[in-house]
């Protein structure tokens, strides 16, 4: 997958929103690639800029609450999405039900949607490998509760000096800093290395502030 990855470099524009600017740059690359299927994750507001594409399947994935996102918060927004997208996928029935709040004929319209649960390979857990290690994996922002984790983990590590903690993730838009001799903070880490690290972790912390659908972090840590 990585060898086929193409990054979209953005230059700041005073005349376009970041979303419109991003999609415009994407469409330039897409014109050369000519994909059959275009997947959009958690950005329903991008759909309005793709309506002129022809002979392509458009699939929208919701990982979070649709009612909290620009482009799907209102009933009108969501009906437009249903009329302009080939398929809408949710990672939980909770987020699917949230999408259809206030929409009539939802049983008929649900045929255009599908719930695709998070998944991972089943592994045998070797508890002998477990260490006194606490992990936090994900975006290092307040929405994911990293500020709660950071303030709390310092107290825990002070009280239990034989325990250590490791943090994996980054967040360029919000800077939260925590320091402790037993706290190791890593940036972006390849997925296979994250899974290897989880083999040693005894406690994995997930402290999001909202009714987050069952995420992959919880699943893989278990």
How would you name each of these model-derived features?
Residues 40-45, 62:
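Short His-centered aromatic/hydrophobic patch
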Residues 65-66, 94-95, 112-125, 172:
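Short beta-strand->alpha-helix junction loop in the catalytic core
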Residues 70-73, 100, 114-133:
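Acidic anion/phosphate-binding donor-loop and adjacent secondary structure
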Residues 71, 78, 83-111:
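A short, active-site helix/loop in glycosyltransferases that binds the activated sugar's phosphate group
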Residues 89, 126-144, 150-154:
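Conserved donor-binding/catalytic core segment of Leloir-type glycosyltransferases
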Residues 137, 150, 163-177:
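Glycosyltransferase donor-sugar binding loop
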Residues 174-195:
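Nucleotide-activated donor-binding/catalytic signature segment of Leloir-type glycosyltransferases, i.e.
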Residues 199-213:
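Acidic donor-binding loop of glycosyltransferase active sites
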